[in-house]
């Protein structure tokens, strides 16, 4: 005989936000959740109202162990739709709700399973009524070799299967039977309370699904639990929500039809901040997972001031460091950054207790080079007189230097020397053979190879220079010094 489908009414049907989101879906969706090979668009604000783990924007994927069909049923429940399940779909949906932190769906599954447990099978009821016959001598029955052995009884408590093998069947009135019944009831009560009081995201010992948002209950501590998680480590948000305990009033079944789950929003810690927020038992886990994201903090005062003093040395505030010169040269700045960091930090750390000796002032910068020569037209100043004279030709238009190969003229000797490179010749050229020389000394050495009788009358070594100047040059600024003719 097939069992009727199970109907789970959603408590979010009267919520205005959920109704609008369900009506607009998939429009205005800011979240895309990938489960298996399927993507489910959703609204992060609606998901955040029922679960801290689901209220994340962007595109992210759920861990292994949740099928797309189960997640679709969970999503329909969140959006205010009633979910109809087959008997075999109740347990996977409850485990998915427990893993993703949807407490209202998990409680609805518990109530549905409790309603089914109130209607036991007739054969099971008959089997439970058989051992109710009292026995006057329980010790004799326990020692009787012909006693009856009962089959295995499987009890499901809080999602866990515990096999209880009863090799002996003592009567209900016996002390052993009473003790066994009391232990079973206590175990069932403890497991149920543990299930109701466990933080969202913890996982029982029977965990069959490798959902990344779950943490195993391990007496070894948080670090061992994180090491045994299958797959890559979860993000900071999922671990943060899984270790944040809920208050006792949040566990009360006060969420009735027409009331949204406001406690999920009110108790939501900041996702983008210090990992694990205010939870204390996960310090080791945080150091194990986010080793590269930690901010090293020390407890003693001298080490604690180190990072602050480094900031103070780079950007000092008035009164925090000894006042130095207003400006430093690049070499002095480098020396200050590399060699005096420790001294500055120590000085800043003990400034309140004892006066720090002032750092010696660097030598003053050399005075600026004097420029006594000024242009009478524009007022521009120069340190050398010939620089001022060359500049003055800009105003007068005088170009005393001329090229012997072309009509090019220049106001500056250096400019004319550069102009010669356009002709591809040296500044000195032999008047007899036309050979070029780069300097006056090389031209003098070259002319010794010619006979003096070949030289024209009135020839001088200066006539080999290709440039001529219309103004007499001083001996100090002459491009070449006059020399005697070679013989």
UniProtKB/Swiss-Prot annotation:
InterPro entries in UniProt: BTB/POZ_dom (IPR000210), SKP1/BTB/POZ_sf (IPR011333), Znf_C2H2_sf (IPR036236), Znf_C2H2_type (IPR013087)
ZnF region ranges: C2H2-type: 373-395, 401-423, 428-450
Localization terms from the record: Nucleus
Biased composition (Polar residues): 308-320
Alphabetical list of SMART domains matching this protein: BTB, ZnF_C2H2
Biased amino acid composition, Pro residues: 357-369
Location (main, coarse): nucleus
Highest taxon above the source species: Eukaryota
Gene Ontology terms: cellular component: nucleoplasm
Biased composition (Basic and acidic residues): 112-166
Segments forming domain BTB: 29-87
GO molecular function, a single term: DNA binding
Region named Disordered: 112-206, 220-244, 308-371, 468-487
Keywords: DNA-binding, Metal-binding, Nucleus, Repeat, Repressor, Transcription, Transcription regulation, Zinc, Zinc-finger
GO biological process, one term: regulation of immune system process
Family named by the database record: Belongs to the krueppel C2H2-type zinc-finger protein family.
Quaternary structure and partners: Homodimer (via PTB domain). Interacts with the N-terminal of FANCC. Interacts with ZBTB16. Interacts with GATA3.
Record note on domains: The C-terminal zinc finger domain functions as a transcriptional transactivator. The BTB (POZ) domain possesses repressor activity.
Name of the molecule in the record: Zinc finger and BTB domain-containing protein 32
Organism the protein comes from: Pan paniscus (Pygmy chimpanzee)
Name of the coding gene: ZBTB32
């Amino acid at each position: 005989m097939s069992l009727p489908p199970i109907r789970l009414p959603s408590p979010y049907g009267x919520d205005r936000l959920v109704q609008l989101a369900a009506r607009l879906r998939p429009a205005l969706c800011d979240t895309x959740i990938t489960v298996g090979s399927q993507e489910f668009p959703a609204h992060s604000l609606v998901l955040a109202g029922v679960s801290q783990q689901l209220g994340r924007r962007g595109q992210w994927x759920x861990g292994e162990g949740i099928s797309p069909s189960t997640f679709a049923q969970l999503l329909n429940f969140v959006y205010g739709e009633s979910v109809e399940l087959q008997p075999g779909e109740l347990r996977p949906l409850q485990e998915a709700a427990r893993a993703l932190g949807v407490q209202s769906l998990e409680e609805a599954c518990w109530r549905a399973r409790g309603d089914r447990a109130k209607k036991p099978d007739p054969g099971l009821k008959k089997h439970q009524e058989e051992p109710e016959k009292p026995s006057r001598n329980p010790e004799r029955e326990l020692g009787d070799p012909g006693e009856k052995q009962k089959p295995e009884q499987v009890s499901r408590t809080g999602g866990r299967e515990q096999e209880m093998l009863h090799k002996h069947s003592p009567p209900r009135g016996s002390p052993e039977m009473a003790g066994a019944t009391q232990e079973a009831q206590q175990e069932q009560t403890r497991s149920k309370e543990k299930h109701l009081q466990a933080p969202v995201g913890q996982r029982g010992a029977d965990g069959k699904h490798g959902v990344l948002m779950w943490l195993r209950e391990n007496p070894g501590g948080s670090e061992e639990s994180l090491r045994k998680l299958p797959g890559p480590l979860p993000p900071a948000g999922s671990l943060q929500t899984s270790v944040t305990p809920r208050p006792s009033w949040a566990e009360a079944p006060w969420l009735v039809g027409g009331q949204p789950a406001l406690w999920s929003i009110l108790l939501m810690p900041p996702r983008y901040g210090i990992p694990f927020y205010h939870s204390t038992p996960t310090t080791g886990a945080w150091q194990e997972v986010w080793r590269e994201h930690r901010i090293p903090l020390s407890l003693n005062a001298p080490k604690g001031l180190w990072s602050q003093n480094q900031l103070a040395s780079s950007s000092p505030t008035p009164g925090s460091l000894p006042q130095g010169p207003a400006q430093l040269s690049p070499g002095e700045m480098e020396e200050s950054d590399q060699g005096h960091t420790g001294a500055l930090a120590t000085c800043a750390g003990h400034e309140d207790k004892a006066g720090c000796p002032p750092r010696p002032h660097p030598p003053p910068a050399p005075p600026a080079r004097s420029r006594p020569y000024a242009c009478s037209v524009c007022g521009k100043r120069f340190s050398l007189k010939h620089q001022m004279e060359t500049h003055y030709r800009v105003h007068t238009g005088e170009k005393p230097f001329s090229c012997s190969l072309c009509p090019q003229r220049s106001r500056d000797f250096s400019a004319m020397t550069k102009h010669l490179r356009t002709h591809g010749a040296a500044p000195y050229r032999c008047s007899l053979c036309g050979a070029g020389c780069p300097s006056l000394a090389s031209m003098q050495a070259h002319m010794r190879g010619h006979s003096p009788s070949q030289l024209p009358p009135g020839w001088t070594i200066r006539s080999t220079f290709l440039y001529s100047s219309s103004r007499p040059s001083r001996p100090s600024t002459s491009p070449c010094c006059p020399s005697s003719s070679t013989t």
